[in-house]
């Protein structure tokens, strides 16, 4: 018989660990953001507000050498650099960044080709290690978009190029053709006044539909959700994985059929229970023997959707003999050099009366980037972190609620059975630190007694969840064949089993979840 239907696994369904959005971002790194705060400084009206920006100008536009009086045929020796150029294009910076050149036009110095709805693109950064006179550009979130950590952040696209800015609306709420994007200009602070101010940096500030679908905040320094300097340091954590699938669906029961369906909850015609006749004795015994030789119920049988609950052994029993971390693990900057400074080329001044003096070497560039000392590096204990991370994800998060606490400034639902509440509660890291270097085999009591099979490393549950697919709303179709699981070493009485003995299969449509039922 067949069972068909559509299943809504609910908003807590999450068939993966971690996050699908900005998963490589540090968990405490903010999105480039703006916020508003009171002005600071002597003689400033404290009631006045000013906008502050924290961001990254990742996109670099190199300017070619177009200065007056420059011989383009002359060459100069550079160390980790390239010829500098004058900032002739800064006068047009108010139009934005020049992303490309329109080769069909003659005057190529005025063609600012950026489309501000999606350019500069956040995934495009520097394409050269050399430092030049350049414009830098990037994107930032306006103060109206409430800050969230970059880890786990998602904003749905609002145009076909992938831009995420909101569409501006009229006073009556009707959408317009314009997007909520403004240009913010920045320059190096000038000593002693407003002279010589030219923007070196342009940020495209926008409001977006910012969401965090599969993460939650676990460190929140400010009580308010609004954008602020304090909320720059929020830290996120992924929501727990939650596989949801049908339990072992079909329970076999052999009973004697006295033609009146005595002892059966429902008759054969009602189809609430599937009652099928056995074959003759030889056929049935041969089929049982075949099934027994093929495998047992700890295998995965997708035909019956009956994968048996099975833990990862490391989850139930902690075998701890320390971590193999004898070798240090280093990481280095991408350019392989680290922090560098710009140096001018010089040479001895051999002019009359200039002994022991030096002069600018006109054959060497003014910008030579040179690093001093060791390459900048950081060390991390990879093995210890992997072990601790495993223990926290697989042991600490599944401990009883009494072992956990609510982070400061985080408000959780009063219903302790909700997915949001379970995710918001965190366990002290010291709970799993205690297992490092014990050198023993531990069977944790909560893992055996508190929902022992509701765990994301339950391979049977995970498999049954995968059979339904990775969507929240899923159509399902379970086909149960006429031949069912055989009972090993079944003792059959003499007689014709075609009419006297039947298997009844109870349709067990109970859902199982990694968070508990």
UniProtKB/Swiss-Prot annotation:
Annotated region (Disordered), positions in chain: 1-48
A single GO BP: symbiont entry into host cell
Keywords tagged on the record: Capsid protein, Cytoplasmic inwards viral transport, Host nucleus, Host-virus interaction, Late protein, Microtubular inwards viral transport, T=25 icosahedral capsid protein, Virion, Virus entry into host cell
Protein location: Virion; Host nucleus
Any one annotated GO CC term: T=25 icosahedral viral capsid
Induction context: Expressed in the late phase of the viral replicative cycle.
Family affiliation: Belongs to the adenoviridae hexon protein family.
Subunit structure of this chain's protein: Homotrimer. Interacts with the capsid vertex protein; this interaction binds the peripentonal hexons to the neighboring penton base. Interacts with the hexon-linking protein; this interaction tethers the hexons surrounding the penton to those situated in the central plate of the facet. Interacts with the hexon-interlacing protein; this interaction lashes the hexons together. Interacts with host dyneins DYNC1LI1 and DYNC1I2; this interaction might be involved in intracellular microtubule-dependent transport of incoming viral capsid.
UniProt function note: Major capsid protein that self-associates to form 240 hexon trimers, each in the shape of a hexagon, building most of the pseudo T=25 capsid. Assembled into trimeric units with the help of the chaperone shutoff protein. Transported by pre-protein VI to the nucleus where it associates with other structural proteins to form an empty capsid. Might be involved, through its interaction with host dyneins, in the intracellular microtubule-dependent transport of incoming viral capsid to the nucleus.
Further facts: All late proteins expressed from the major late promoter are produced by alternative splicing and alternative polyadenylation of the same gene giving rise to non-overlapping ORFs. A leader sequence is present in the N-terminus of all these mRNAs and is recognized by the viral shutoff protein to provide expression although conventional translation via ribosome scanning from the cap has been shut off in the host cell.
Record-given protein name: Hexon protein
């Amino acid at each position: 018989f067949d069972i068909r239907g559509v299943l809504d696994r609910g908003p807590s369904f999450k068939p993966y660990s971690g996050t699908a959005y900005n998963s490589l971002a540090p968990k405490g790194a903010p999105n480039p953001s703006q916020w508003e705060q009171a002005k600071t400084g002597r003689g400033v009206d404290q009631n006045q507000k000013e906008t502050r920006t924290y961001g990254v100008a990742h996109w670099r536009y190199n300017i070619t050498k177009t200065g007056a009086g420059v011989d383009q045929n002359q060459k100069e020796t550079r160390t980790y650099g390239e010829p500098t150029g004058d900032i002739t294009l800064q006068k047009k910076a108010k139009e934005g960044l020049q992303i490309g050149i329109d080769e069909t036009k003659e005057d190529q110095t005025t063609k600012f080709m950026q489309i501000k709805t999606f350019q500069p693109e956040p995934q495009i950064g520097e394409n050269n290690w050399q430092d030049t006179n350049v414009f830098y550009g990037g994107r930032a979130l306006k103060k109206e978009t409430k800050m969230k950590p970059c880890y786990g952040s998602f904003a749905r696209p609002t145009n076909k190029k992938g831009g995420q800015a909101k569409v501006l609306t009229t006073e009556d709420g009707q959408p317009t053709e314009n997007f909520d994007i403004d240009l913010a200009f920045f320059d190096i602070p000038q000593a002693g006044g407003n002279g010589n101010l030219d923007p070196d940096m342009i940020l495209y500030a926008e409001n977006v539909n910012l969401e965090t679908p599969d993460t939650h905040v676990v460190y929140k320094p400010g009580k308010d959700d609004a954008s602020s300097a304090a909320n720059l340091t929020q830290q996120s954590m992924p929501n727990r994985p939650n596989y949801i699938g049908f339990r072992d669906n079909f329970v076999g029961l052999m009973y004697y059929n006295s033609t009146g369906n005595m002892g059966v909850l429902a008759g054969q015609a009602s189809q609430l229970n599937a009652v099928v006749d056995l074959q003759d004795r030889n056929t049935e015994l041969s089929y049982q023997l075949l099934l027994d030789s093929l495998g047992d119920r700890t295998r995965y049988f997708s035909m019956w959707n009956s994968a048996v609950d099975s833990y990862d052994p490391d989850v139930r029993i902690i075998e701890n003999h320390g971590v193999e971390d004898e070798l240090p693990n280093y990481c280095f900057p991408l350019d392989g050099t680290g922090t560098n400074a710009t140096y001018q080329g010089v040479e001895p001044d051999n002019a009359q009366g200039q002994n022991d003096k030096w002069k600018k070497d006109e054959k060497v560039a003014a910008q030579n980037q040179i690093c001093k000392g060791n390459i900048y590096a950081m060390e991390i204990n990879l093995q210890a972190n992997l072990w601790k991370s495993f223990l926290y994800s697989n042991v600490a998060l599944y401990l009883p609620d009494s072992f956990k606490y609510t982070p400061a400034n985080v408000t959780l639902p009063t219903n302790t059975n909700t997915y949001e509440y379970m995710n918001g509660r965190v366990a002290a890291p010291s709970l799993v630190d205690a297992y490092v270097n014990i050198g023993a085999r531990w069977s944790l009591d909560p893992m055996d007694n508190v929902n022992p099979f509701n765990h994301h490393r339950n391979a049977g549950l995970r498999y049954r969840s995968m059979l339904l697919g990775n969507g929240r709303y899923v159509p399902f179709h379970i086909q149960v064949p006429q031949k069912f699981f055989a009972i090993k070493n079944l003792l059959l009485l003499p007689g014709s089993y075609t009419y006297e003995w039947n298997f009844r299969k109870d349709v067990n449509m109970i859902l199982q979840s990694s968070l508990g039922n």
